[in-house]
Amino acid sequence: MSQSKSNILWFLPTHGDGRYLGTATGGREVNFNYLRQIAQAADQLGYFGVLLPTGRSCEDSWIVASSVAPFTERLRYLVAVRPGLQSPSVAARMTATLDRITNGRLLINVVTGGDPVENKGDGIFLGHDERYEVTREFLNVYSDLLGGKAVNVEGKHIRIEDGKLLFPPVQSPRPPLYFGGSSDAGIDVAVDTVDKYLTWGEPPAQVAEKIARVREVANARGRKLSFGIRLHVIVRETNEEAWSAANELIKHVSDDTIARAQRNFARMDSVGQQRMAQLHGGKRDKLEISPNLWAGVGLVRGGAGTALVGDAQTVAARIKEYQDIGIDTFIMSGYPHLEEAYRFAELVFPLLSLDHGSNVTRLHHNSGPFGETVGNDYRPSRLASQS
């Protein structure tokens, strides 16, 4: 039986990086040159792409992606659209432009947002389920525009008149949509609107239950989704070295720092974040929550809070466990991100079957219409065809 192939993405740490968590000790200046280094390393090492985080704790993902992309050749960029923060028509134009200037190397991460405090700071005062209503309306308009349709819609949250996109994306009908949402409302939106359902790194049994739940809803609606997972990784040449590195990563984290971080996470209405917090309960004593799955990162970091820990063979075996339950995309990271990008690729890639062979440079680079747009509304070729 042949081993299933996977896509492996890395991570651009636009919110900060360093050798240790929860401290300025060993911290690293994260500037443009450093992010470019990581992106170029990921490109040269053969990663499928990189995820860029979103939110007020990090640099703007669209600006960073458009800045570093010209320094890479094959690397894809998983960048967030934010329903409720962006108009779907403006987001569609941004998407098409970045897809065009990267020659089809854009992936889209749909982020509804699970922190009410941050949401209010950005002008969003809707409750949990209402935000997913906005996400559904947003994605319907957004996908129609990218697919070349004219849009007129009056929804509960979004109203568009004569919406259209003059410059289409390179990828047809649009770049792939990735989406994570563990609540019933999130899953309900995902199965109707996106291509890949994402989960944070829960134990395999819990991930299998979640996948089965999503598939059941999707099958009932005649839809089929693929699945991805977001994990950290601590891989070394021996298991002992890997576990030592895991303990080193949190050696400067104080109990006060953990308590403060957990209070912040507790205010969130994200079901996924709640599930992450339940894995460790804010305590250090039982952080290996499943064989070689360590929850230490989640003591102080929001979002993805678990890491695969072990030697290369062990980490590869755990990845294959997730593959066996339906995961085909792994979004990985490690501290510091430059060194760990090399370490993970050099030690683990040879043990995996990777589906990274597609050559995006073969896509047709649509450089736009010949001649200037007429009246801010028509491409010259279209105007001529109507005469």
Swiss-Prot record:
Residues 365-387 are annotated as: Disordered. Disulfide bonds: none annotated. It catalyses: an alkanesulfonate + FMNH2 + O2 = an aldehyde + FMN + sulfite + H2O + 2 H(+). Keywords: Flavoprotein, FMN, Monooxygenase, Oxidoreductase. It comes from the Bacteria. It is an enzyme of class 1 (oxidoreductase). This is Alkanesulfonate monooxygenase.
